[in-house]
From Swiss-Prot:
Keyword annotations: Acetylation, Cytoplasmic vesicle, Membrane, Phosphoprotein, Synapse, Transmembrane, Transmembrane helix, Transport
PANTHER family, sorted: GH10249P, MFS-TYPE TRANSPORTER SLC18B1
Compositionally skewed regions (Low complexity) per UniProt: 1-10
A matching Pfam family: MFS_1
TM spans (from-to): 34-54, 71-91, 101-121, 128-148, 168-188, 196-216, 236-256, 275-295, 307-327, 334-354, 380-400, 410-430
Organism: Mus musculus
Effect of inactivating the gene: Mutant mice show impaired learning ability and memory functions associated with decreased accumulation of polyamines in the brain.
Positions bearing Phosphoserine: S21
Protein name: MFS-type transporter SLC18B1
GO biological process: serotonin uptake; spermidine transport; spermine transport
Gene: Slc18b1
Topological type in the membrane: Multi-pass membrane protein
Length: 459
């Protein structure tokens, strides 16, 4: 697409061009756009279900096999580390591989290894079990990294003026996957044992592949990104701060995977099935609130940055209350824990949804062209930074819970989002101040030029 037809600085990334966004939303969705939505929704739902089923029962099962809390955290965390590497590679080479092929292949790998994870309980306890858990999770992460990178790029290409709205709406399906995964996994585990949850959900993902092969459109490959350097993108100051925001939010989610279920079981003596319902508070509120924040981000782009900032600050407060931190002298109660998780889900949607369009706007404002290659780079960066946090969260969470307990560990986790929220607030205030000074200087220069032009006429 040439520069005249490019929605890059304006429409892309959240509706900086209200006119373009209105024209886009006023038209009915094309058949191709509907198919893209169906494909992305099926991937979000299936992969999030397979990702989230581990929470309620795997930590306890791994303990039986001789894994420590730190090792369990590393099993959760290695997924994110290799999703990070996969996102960087696949984002860079999206143009060469092809978005549709990458999407389908990623789903196939993820579904297949999920089934394999279901037979790991047949292995002897100790190093063999732990090593195979790492191996299967690593391959699953590579598959998911491919699928999510391709999905983000396809969505941004199909909906250039409504990225936040579409991604926020699709987070409903991510949320549904996160909502359905833990209770469904816990129920199947209690009823049928370790194998059935993985085999059942792995088969669901594999059954979605023929549908996506048929309906997902193929976008014409463009030229090599060439000068569109990933490192140029990453070294932009605003992009670096946005990356820090993503890492801090992702690490908060990752922190809960190996720690929350054990804390709830020990503190409130809940069964595995009820632990899955506790996870429901976070996932359901995130799924419900995400479309609203996506719509707000596109319709009111100036509000986007403050949604991001306040979402981070609220998330920090939630993690202080999750234990709660002993300094507050508040008794830990189940209703309070669930309430905090619900608020955390809303604040997470407030922070996460505006981030991707902010990244796109930053890239386009700094000379990156509107193309599938740029979308691949931004999608890869988003996925990579999310994976950094998702890698650090479980490992640090498992380690800190062993050393200082869940209450203090959660409070320390909240400091991440507090720091990222304050950093972004300071940057946006500086950015606004700089823009105002530049505007005043331009107005002053224009006035001087007008006066100079009028002087000869007065004489």
């Amino acid at each position: 697409m040439d520069e005249a037809g490019s929605p890059a600085p304006a429409g892309t990334g959240g509706g900086d061009d209200p006119g373009g966004s209105t024209r886009e939303t006023s038209r009915r969705l094309s058949r191709e756009q509907i198919f893209v939505l169906v494909s992305a929704a099926s991937m979000n739902l299936g992969c999030m279900m397979t990702y989230s089923i581990l929470g309620p029962f795997f930590p306890k099962e791994a303990e039986k096999k001789g894994a420590s809390n730190t090792m369990i955290g590393m099993i959760f965390g290695c997924y994110a580390l290799f999703e990070l590497l996969a996102s960087l590679v696949f984002g860079k080479y999206l143009v060469h591989i092809g978005a549709k092929f990458m999407f389908i292949a990623g789903m196939f790998v993820s579904g297949g290894v999920t089934i394999l994870f279901g037979v790991l309980d047949q292995l002897p306890e100790g190093p063999i079990f732990i090593a195979m858990c790492f191996l299967v999770r690593i391959v699953d992460a590579i598959g998911f990294g491919a699928a999510i990178t391709a999905s983000s790029s396809i969505l941004a290409k199909a909906f250039p003026n409504n990225v936040a709205t579409v991604m926020g709406s699709l987070e409903v399906f991510s949320g549904l996957g996160l909502v359905a995964g833990p209770p469904l996994g816990g129920l199947l585990y209690q009823s049928f044992g370790y194998e059935v949850p993985f085999i059942f959900l792995g088969c669901i993902v594999l059954l979605m592949i023929p549908l996506n092969l048929y309906i997902l459109p193929s976008y014409a490959q463009e030229s090599d990104p060439g000068k569109q350097s990933f490192w140029k993108l990453v070294t932009l100051p605003k992009m670096g701060l946005l990356a820090f925001v993503i890492i801090s939010l992702s690490s908060c989610f990752g922190f809960l995977d190996p720690t929350l279920s054990l804390f709830v079981m020990e503190k409130f003596s809940l069964s595995t099935g009820y632990v899955g319902l506790v996870f429901l508070g976070l996932s359901l509120s995130y799924a419900i609130s995400s479309p609203l924040f996506g719509l707000l981000s596109d319709k009111m782009p100036t509000l986007r940055k403050w949604l991001l900032v306040f979402g981070n600050l609220i998330t920090a407060g939630c993690y202080m209350l999750l234990g709660p931190v002993p300094l507050l002298h508040i008794k830990s109660q189940l209703w309070l824990l669930v309430l905090v998780l619900v608020v955390n889900g809303i604040s997470a949607g407030m922070s996460i949804i505006p981030t991707f369009p902010e990244m796109l706007s930053c890239a386009y404002a700094n000379g990156f062209e509107d193309s599938i290659s740029t979308l691949g780079l931004v999608s890869g960066l988003f996925g990579a930074m999310w994976s950094v946090g998702a890698f650090m969260g479980p490992i640090l969470g498992g380690f800190l819970c062993e050393k200082i307990g869940f209450e203090w560990a959660a409070a320390m986790q909240g400091l991440w989002t507090l720091l990222s929220g304050v950093s972004m607030a300071l940057f946006y205030l500086w950015e606004d101040s700089t823009a105002r000074r530049r505007s005043k200087a331009q107005n002053s220069l224009g006035t001087e030029e007008e006066r100079a032009a009028l002087l000869p006429n007065d004489t």
